[in-house]
Amino acid sequence: MILAFQLSVFALVAISFLLVVGVPVVLASPDGWSTSKNAVFSGASLWIALVFLVGVLNSFIS
């Protein structure tokens, strides 16, 4: 269970870093938003799911 928690926290940190770097790049590029809108929304949805997963797994660990 601890390994699943650690992997989910690592995934959350990695996705957060990618979104922090990637979203401004997409928004700054010409015609970037219309071509990468689905990727940004997918990343944000994955981030929200990981936040809830980390919260649930944390309740089992603590």
Curated annotation (Swiss-Prot):
Subcellular localization: Plastid, Chloroplast thylakoid membrane
Coiled coil (residue ranges): none
The protein's assembly and partners: PSII is composed of 1 copy each of membrane proteins PsbA, PsbB, PsbC, PsbD, PsbE, PsbF, PsbH, PsbI, PsbJ, PsbK, PsbL, PsbM, PsbT, PsbY, PsbZ, Psb30/Ycf12, at least 3 peripheral proteins of the oxygen-evolving complex and a large number of cofactors. It forms dimeric complexes.
Functional summary from the UniProt entry: May control the interaction of photosystem II (PSII) cores with the light-harvesting antenna, regulates electron flow through the 2 photosystem reaction centers. PSII is a light-driven water plastoquinone oxidoreductase, using light energy to abstract electrons from H(2)O, generating a proton gradient subsequently used for ATP formation.
Xref: HAMAP family: PSII_PsbZ
Mode of membrane association: Multi-pass membrane protein
Gene3D superfamilies: Photosystem II PsbZ, reaction centre
Organism: Chaetosphaeridium globosum
Gene Ontology biological process: photosynthesis; photosystem II stabilization
Family statement drawn from the similarity comment of this UniProt entry: Belongs to the PsbZ family.
GO CC terms, sorted: chloroplast thylakoid membrane; photosystem II reaction center
Transmembrane listed as a keyword: yes
Listed transmembrane segments: 8-28, 41-61
Name recorded for this polypeptide: Photosystem II reaction center protein Z
Record keywords: Chloroplast, Membrane, Photosynthesis, Photosystem II, Plastid, Reaction center, Thylakoid, Transmembrane, Transmembrane helix
